[in-house]
């Protein structure tokens, strides 16, 4: 992987190795993708102050996330269908995160189940939860996460209604899926992916297996999921989840100051400033645009995490400078996974680690705690 020097390099390999439908599922956004682009562009528009003649020989990226030590201020975000990018992808990604000394978040919509991942890693991981109409099943998922010793619950709060993603529809990533000659030919042109994913033992929504009587087929489960996102979800439901989840609770998908104020009243330990990677409300502001005001409003009440548009270590530095305590990455590590499996995730994390370290040095800071808006040219 010597020729791989940035996340975009991993993205290009990912694009070549994985069928278009699954690559686009990870890479694209909703509607016109304005918010997806804004996440990236608004971060890159933020400029740094270059500082000179400062001793930066002892740079240290370590920090704490929710009171636990972390080797750097990164978290692998929950990504649905990770195991369709690379066979047993969730296990590979979790192992890479734990080797790097950072948290991994397993999606409700994963291919590998909570139990699959727990049986194949050495340390606790986080679990992401979608609240569905079937509250009994949600309680069961929480109980399974507790049994697996998951150390935090990430509750996604911005998916009561699913944003329309044009690329998914055009690629037949619908429920039920649409098959075409072009899709079959695309699959046939990716023999390594077919051998790993389609011939692997895990090819359905692992956390949902057994819930529908009589079938574990991914199409049937997908059809059920499409009917389960709950438009009645409200703050009282958060109270209920808080009452049955004994560990750290994180609310993911907050973009508005008023919502952040309500989030701070729930007893959650943290929130994630996020627009679901530009996959939900197209036309919403970028995550970095709203981060400072949310930090100002509730940063003294709960830990603020950032998600959306991170493609480099410089982007991590920008988010930290504007008040985030840590950053979630999704596409950045999924590109590594789709390109090279577990070693690709290792590579993505190595790239981000090195870029963050170099940027800290050029801005004259040695520790994560030193990073604030003084490193920015604003």
List each model region and its residues:
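Glycine-rich active-site/cofactor-binding loop and its immediate structural neighborhood
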Residues: 70-109
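Active-site-adjacent beta-strand anchor residues
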Residues: 29, 107, 128, 155, ...
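Short, conserved beta-strand segments within well-ordered enzyme catalytic domains
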Residues: 47, 62-64, 73-77, 103-107, ...
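A gly/proline- and charged-residue-enriched helix-loop-helix capping module
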Residues: 99-120, 124-138
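Short, solvent-exposed loop/turn segments at secondary-structure boundaries
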Residues: 87-88, 282-285, 340-341
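Alpha/beta enzyme core
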Residues: 81, 95, 120, 133-306, ...
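An N-cap/entry alpha-helix motif that binds or orients negatively charged groups
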Residues: 1-67, 172-233, 369-371
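Alpha/beta catalytic cores of nucleotide-metabolism and tRNA/nucleoside-modifying enzymes
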Residues: 1-44, 289-378
């Amino acid at each position: 992987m010597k020729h791989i020097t940035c996340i975009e390099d991993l993205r290009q390999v990912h694009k070549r190795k994985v069928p278009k439908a699954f690559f686009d599922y990870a890479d694209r956004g909703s509607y016109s993708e304005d918010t997806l682009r804004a996440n990236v562009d608004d971060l890159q528009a933020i400029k740094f102050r270059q500082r000179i003649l400062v001793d930066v020989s002892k740079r240290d990226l370590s920090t704490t996330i929710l009171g636990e030590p972390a080797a750097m201020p990164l978290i692998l975000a929950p990504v649905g269908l990770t195991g369709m990018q690379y066979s047993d992808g969730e296990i590979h990604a979790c192992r890479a995160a734990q080797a790097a000394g950072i948290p991994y978040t397993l999606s409700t919509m994963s291919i590998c189940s909570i139990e699959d991942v727990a049986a194949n890693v050495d340390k606790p991981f986080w679990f992401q939860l979608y609240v569905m109409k079937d509250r009994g099943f949600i309680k069961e998922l929480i109980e399974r996460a507790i049994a697996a010793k998951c150390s935090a619950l990430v509750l996604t709060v911005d998916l009561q209604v699913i944003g329309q993603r044009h690329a998914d529809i055009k690629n037949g990533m619908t429920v039920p899926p649409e098959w075409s000659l072009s899709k079959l030919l695309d699959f046939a042109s990716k023999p390594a992916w077919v051998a790993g994913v389609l011939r692997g033992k895990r090819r359905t929504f692992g956390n949902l297996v057994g819930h529908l009587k009589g079938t574990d087929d991914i199409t049937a489960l997908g059809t059920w999921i499409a009917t389960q996102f709950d438009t009645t979800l409200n703050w009282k439901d958060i109270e209920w989840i808080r009452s049955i989840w004994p560990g750290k609770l994180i609310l993911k998908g907050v973009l508005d100051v008023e919502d952040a104020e309500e989030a701070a009243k729930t007893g959650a330990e943290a929130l994630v400033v996020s627009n679901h990677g530009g996959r939900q409300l197209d036309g919403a502001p970028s995550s970095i645009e709203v981060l400072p005001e949310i930090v100002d409003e509730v940063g003294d009440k709960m830990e603020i995490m950032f998600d959306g548009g991170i493609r480099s270590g410089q982007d991590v530095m920008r988010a930290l400078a504007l008040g985030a305590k840590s950053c979630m990455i999704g596409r950045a590590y999924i590109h590594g996974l789709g390109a090279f499996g577990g070693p690709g995730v290792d590579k993505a994390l190595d790239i981000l680690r090195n870029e963050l370290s170099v940027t800290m040095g050029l801005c004259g800071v040695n520790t994560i705690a030193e990073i604030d808006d003084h490193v920015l040219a604003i």
